[in-house]
Amino acid sequence: MSKTAQKRLLKELQQLIKDSPPGIVAGPKSENNIFIWDCLIQGPPDTPYADGVFNAKLEFPKDYPLSPPKLTFTPSILHPNIYPNGEVCISILHSPGDDPNMYELAEERWSPVQSVEKILLSVMSMLSEPNIESGANIDACILWRDNRPEFERQVKLSILKSLGF
């Protein structure tokens, strides 16, 4: 277990506890493992996700912050940049050099100066503004592009279902 990663994660946790961005709650799943965090992300206003609060899991590699964490929504949500298994696909979570399709600028990808807060804010931004040019869920991309009302209806239904309705 990397002491550098542990120290960095504890520092980031303290910062989030002290000054968490609105609509975001995050922290370690247990006291015994600082490398797996649970997150709650409130859907941004004026989006199909506005009425939802979404569970996600952040998994940090042992060499964090040299390598990016993985963020997965549990359960998955319908979104062009979220794989059907719930894994989020955005630039900030991609290692430098991880761009086979040449869609991303190097400065958009992961670097050790990024933080948990920046990741979660980027995910909130992604919920507001999907990037269908670099989609992870092709069906969601097509629905977003070709039938926005149906896309929004399906998102709202999934929110109601997640709330037990």
Swiss-Prot record:
Keywords: ATP-binding, Cadmium, Cadmium resistance, Endoplasmic reticulum, Membrane, Nucleotide-binding, Thioester bond, Transferase, Ubl conjugation, Ubl conjugation pathway. The keyword Transferase applies. It holds the Pfam family UQ_con. InterPro entries: Ub_conjugating_enzyme, UBQ-conjugat_E2_core, UBQ-conjugating_AS, UBQ-conjugating_enzyme/RWD. Gene3D superfamilies: Ubiquitin Conjugating Enzyme. It catalyses: S-ubiquitinyl-[E1 ubiquitin-activating enzyme]-L-cysteine + [E2 ubiquitin-conjugating enzyme]-L-cysteine = [E1 ubiquitin-activating enzyme]-L-cysteine + S-ubiquitinyl-[E2 ubiquitin-conjugating enzyme]-L-cysteine. There is a cross-link at residue 89 (Glycyl cysteine thioester (Cys-Gly) (interchain with G-Cter in ubiquitin)). Induction: By cadmium. Residues 4-164 form the UBC core domain. Catalyzes the covalent attachment of ubiquitin to other proteins. Functions in degradation of misfolded or regulated proteins localized in the endoplasmic reticulum (ER) lumen or membrane via the ubiquitin-proteasome system. Forms a heterodimer with CUE1. Interacts with SSM4/DOA10 and HDR1. Interacts with UFD4. Belongs to the ubiquitin-conjugating enzyme family. Present with 2100 molecules/cell in log phase SD medium. This is Ubiquitin-conjugating enzyme E2 7.
